[in-house]
Amino acid sequence: MSRRNRAPRRDVPPDPKYGSRLVTMLIRKLMMRGKASLAARILYEALDIVRERTGQDPLPLLENAVRNATPLVEVKARRVGGATYQVPVEVRGERGTSLALRWLVTFSRTRPGRTMAAKLANELIDAANETGSAIRRREEVHRMAEANKAFAHYRY
């Protein structure tokens, strides 16, 4: 165990264009090598593509996509006696959102396509429609937790 104090949670400021904390969180997940303005430009472009394709406000669609990709349970490794068990645990809200955003960005990067904005827009639309790689990943995590339900009594 670490002897140091835990770092306090930093509050996430809302982004300037949409006034949404979720958008800021997604910009930060997209960002590579500290290039926040580039990440913001990519996300805003992706949201414009979403608006163009669906003909509706992209913010509720983004919230819906994140909600659909958020896992409710996950498995954590727990050593008991010489064996390591995959113990299902509930996911706290903030971690669930963080995982969903991470999966959306990761699977957007692996998608075939021309620009990152287009790939992200496609992944968001797919997640909002409950398809796509991020949703598949959530289902996989849920299946793992369901399969290891027998070890739930080892919970932390």
Curated annotation (Swiss-Prot):
This is Small ribosomal subunit protein uS7. GO terms for cellular component: small ribosomal subunit. Keywords: Ribonucleoprotein, Ribosomal protein, RNA-binding, rRNA-binding, tRNA-binding. The keyword Lyase does not apply. One of the primary rRNA binding proteins, it binds directly to 16S rRNA where it nucleates assembly of the head domain of the 30S subunit. Is located at the subunit interface close to the decoding center, probably blocks exit of the E-site tRNA. The keyword Cell division does not apply. GO terms for molecular function: rRNA binding; structural constituent of ribosome; tRNA binding. One of its GO terms (biological process) is translation. PANTHER family: RIBOSOMAL PROTEIN S7. Part of the 30S ribosomal subunit. Contacts proteins S9 and S11. It comes from the Bacteria. Belongs to the universal ribosomal protein uS7 family. It holds the Pfam family Ribosomal_S7.
